[in-house]
Amino acid sequence: MSRKINDTFDACFWEEYLESQGSRLPPLPDVQRITPRVVRVLAGNPGGFQLQGTNTYLVGSGREKILIDTGQGLPVWIDHIAQVVAENDLKIVAALITHWHGDHTGGVPDLLVHFPHLKSAIYKNQPDRGQQDILDGQVFQVEGATIRALHTPGHAVDHMCFVLEEEQAIFTGDNVLGHGFTVVEDLGAYTNSLGIMNDQGCQIGYPAHGVVITDMPAKMAEYRDQRLRRERQVISALRESRQKNAGRGSITVQEVVQSVHGTVPEDVSKKALEPFMQEVLLKLAGDRKVAFELQGGVKRWFIVGNRV
């Protein structure tokens, strides 16, 4: 399934992400109790972009539960949720949404049909009409679960993660996945959000896609190293251009892609690699490591001074 993350990025391709999809993903059960206070319910929407499907979670050790995310809106998801609630005499008291993408919000209408008491208890940063706002640092509690909200934009402007204090665990949303890497809307904001997530000191990660992350510090280091590797590749391309050409040796984002990746199909470059490299360049510009000049209305990028 292809969907737009921003105005330029068609999320049908991202190199490391799709490489991870080429491997065999471990199967996940439709419903699984992961710990005494966390039950995972798959949304029934497996695919190249959603991995085994969107993970939704029922959280709490008592009768009352907090739901995290609502899947894509497929009937199988609400059927599983309703079955778990009925068989265990549970009550969902609130639903927390990690971000606006349809594979996380699509189940809200079905949820309200089955559980109309939740009409005033759907929480989301930058809420839709009738929903409640989630503030950074806001705390939600049920028996056995204290959930603290973190505003962590980058993958999406409204992205929230949720720390489960009792388990030293974090619901990572789409910021960190159980397999491979995520797509990013704003790399500068995303980099800052990774730092916020890492600072929580959580050991376990419950992602919105993929398996449980059993070593969160190691996973965060993996994500940091991947981002830094991409920055080094871009810097290397700009440095090589400056060495080969007179003046600043400025080059276009298309030329950066060609330097880093070689010759790739035009649609792959336009739809995926160029928007991603543009985000890397903008992040480096924010760090004052690179800048651009306009030539014929086209941005040409170069290294700033001798900073790198």
UniProtKB/Swiss-Prot annotation:
Binding site for Zn(2+) 1: H99, H101
Pfam families: Lactamase_B (PF00753)
Reactions this protein catalyses: atrochrysone carboxyl-[ACP] + H2O = atrochrysone carboxylate + holo-[ACP] + H(+)
Molecular function (Gene Ontology), one example: hydrolase activity
UniProt-listed Enzyme Commission number(s): 3.1.2.-
Comment on bound cofactor: Binds 2 Zn(2+) ions per subunit.
Keyword field: Hydrolase, Metal-binding, Zinc
Keyword Zinc applies: yes
Annotated GO biological process: secondary metabolite biosynthetic process
Signal peptide per UniProt: none
Residues annotated as binding Zn(2+) 2: D103, H104
Family indicated by similarity: Belongs to the metallo-beta-lactamase superfamily.
Name under which the protein is recorded: Atrochrysone carboxyl ACP thioesterase
